Amino acid sequence: VATVDCSGYPKPACTMEYMPLCGSDNKTYGNKCNFCNAVVDSNGTLTLSHFGKC
């Protein structure tokens, strides 16, 4: 199972770095920062489906 360590999030701003991750909501996130901010916003209901685009 793929996991991402989101400790230290949310961050106020994310870089534009493109390293896509696919969330359990079937949405592609541009990078870990964007994904982790969304995880925090979801109160932990969002998880990583896999690395790369959905």
Swiss-Prot record:
The superkingdom of the source organism is Eukaryota
Q: Which Gene3D superfamilies match?
A: 3.30.60.30
Query: Which UniProt key words apply to this protein?
Result: Disulfide bond, Glycoprotein, Protease inhibitor, Repeat, Secreted, Serine protease inhibitor
- Cross-referenced CDD domains: KAZAL_FS
* Stretch forming the signal peptide: none
GO CC field = extracellular region
State its location(s).
Secreted
Indicate yes or no for the key word rRNA processing: no
Main location group: secreted
Keyword match Chaperone: no
According to the entry, every stretch annotated as the Kazal-like domain falls at 4-54
- Which residue positions hold the site described Reactive bond 3? M16, E17
Annotated S-S bridges: C6-C36, C14-C33, C22-C54
Kindly list the GO molecular function terms attached to this UniProt entry: serine-type endopeptidase inhibitor activity
Q: List the protein's name.
A: Ovomucoid
Q: What's the source species' lineage? A: Eukaryota, Metazoa, Chordata, Craniata, Vertebrata
